[in-house]
């Protein structure tokens, strides 16, 4: 839907769109993509290329209880709030919101590359919450405890989390 070249899931699934793949898991396409990347970076090992990536602090997946009947309405409300915040030039923890991607919930991107995600679980009576900080583990926890958790706590339909950071 976004025209992304590649997509990756925590479960280990990966997807490549044209011109590399056909939109589904394909180990040979993944191997060819890695070999192509190494060919474009002569003299660098795969570990050298990995070290060049920025460090990110990503939370585990946190899932507050929310009934199947209520979860999509809750997510619609949260999407609307974040869209309004983004449209008004809003910020989260002092960082300007640069985008609110609303495919299957909302992923709010901040100016430093950090983000927060809220969506409905597709197969459980839960929401799915993930946060990522490009600054530190403490900042990752702050994105959850000072932004997402209080926003969801305003809704009586949202219950206890299965785990928290």
Language-model regions, residue ranges each:
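Phosphate-binding and adjacent anionic-ligand microenvironments
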Residues: 1-165
């Amino acid at each position: 839907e976004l025209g992304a070249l590649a997509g990756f899931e925590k479960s280990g699934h990966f997807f490549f769109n044209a011109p590399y793949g056909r939109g589904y898991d394909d180990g040979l396409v993944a191997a060819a993509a890695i070999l192509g990347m190494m060919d474009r970076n002569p003299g660098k090992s795969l570990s050298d290329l990995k070290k060049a990536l920025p460090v990110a602090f990503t939370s585990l997946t946190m899932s507050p209880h929310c009934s199947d009947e209520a979860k999509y309405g809750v997510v619609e409300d949260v999407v609307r709030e974040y869209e309004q915040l983004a449209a008004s030039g809003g910020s989260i923890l002092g960082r300007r919101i640069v985008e609110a991607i609303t495919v299957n919930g909302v992923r709010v991107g901040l100016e430093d590359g950090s983000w927060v995600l809220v969506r409905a679980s597709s197969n459980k009576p839960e929401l799915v919450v993930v946060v990522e900080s490009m600054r530190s583990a403490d900042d990752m926890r702050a994105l959850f405890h000072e932004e997402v958790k209080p926003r969801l706590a305003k809704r009586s339909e949202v219950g206890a989390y299965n785990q928290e950071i």
